[in-house]
């Protein structure tokens, strides 16, 4: 029976009680040996013989990338062991979560002195913009991923964020300079002009000697 707007009436579903035994057996066999069943079994058997991907946390931990973005660290200079941070405030300005706050003042020697450097980890989204924009590689991301605790002693202030002097090594994580950074440096136009002038001087030197 055809209705308006190309709608059709579906045939009424036969009640299971009214079906014959043979019809129910046929329906059961079709459902049991359909392609959907074998595709599901294929996926289950493939996962059964594949290497396990689950870990027993917290007894085990997944390996992290060297450039993983976790809890921040404040770096020191390798030579003088002084803080790398110069208080420029670029990390505070670029922070999209507005979780970094820097308070600076003028020291006795006339240089800028950092009075307070705080990061609200409750608002931080670990985007890494602060580490990218830092001109002195003063703030980087470490590998401490577990930052939830019920004890106040677990949390700290700026002295706890600073890298300890006994473990001063060149940082290679997120925000650091790449290994081949020197090879990827592009020369400036001024260096090209200097090279051209040196080449011209080297070419003119033999001509002057021959004239003499």
UniProtKB/Swiss-Prot annotation:
Protein origin, superkingdom: Bacteria
SUPFAM superfamilies cross-referenced by the UniProt entry: alpha-helical ferredoxin
The organism's taxonomic lineage, starting at the top: Bacteria, Pseudomonadati, Campylobacterota, Epsilonproteobacteria, Campylobacterales
GO MF entries: 4 iron, 4 sulfur cluster binding; iron ion binding; NADH:ubiquinone reductase (non-electrogenic) activity; quinone binding
HAMAP family the record matches: NDH1_NuoI
Family classification: Belongs to the complex I 23 kDa subunit family.
Cofactor(s) the protein needs: [4Fe-4S] cluster
Gene3D superfamilies: 3.30.70.3270
Known function: NDH-1 shuttles electrons from NADH, via FMN and iron-sulfur (Fe-S) centers, to quinones in the respiratory chain. The immediate electron acceptor for the enzyme in this species is believed to be ubiquinone. Couples the redox reaction to proton translocation (for every two electrons transferred, four hydrogen ions are translocated across the cytoplasmic membrane), and thus conserves the redox energy in a proton gradient.
Topology within the bilayer: Peripheral membrane protein
Binding residues for [4Fe-4S] cluster 2: 95, 124, 127, 130
Keywords on record: 4Fe-4S, Cell inner membrane, Cell membrane, Iron, Iron-sulfur, Membrane, Metal-binding, NAD, Quinone, Repeat, Translocase, Ubiquinone
Listed name of the protein: NADH-quinone oxidoreductase subunit I
SUBUNIT field: NDH-1 is composed of 14 different subunits. Subunits NuoA, H, J, K, L, M, N constitute the membrane sector of the complex.
GO biological process: aerobic respiration
Subcellular location as annotated: Cell inner membrane
4Fe-4S ferredoxin-type domain mapped to chain residues: 76-105, 115-144
Enzyme class (EC, first level): translocase
Binding sites annotated in the UniProt record for [4Fe-4S] cluster 1: 85, 88, 91, 134
Catalytic activity: a quinone + NADH + 5 H(+)(in) = a quinol + NAD(+) + 4 H(+)(out)
GO cellular component entries: plasma membrane
Cofactor annotation remark: Binds 2 [4Fe-4S] clusters per subunit.
EC number(s) given by UniProt: 7.1.1.-
InterPro entries registered for this protein in UniProt: 4Fe4S_Fe-S-bd (IPR017896), 4Fe4S_Fe_S_CS (IPR017900), NADH_quinone_OxRdtase_chainI (IPR010226)
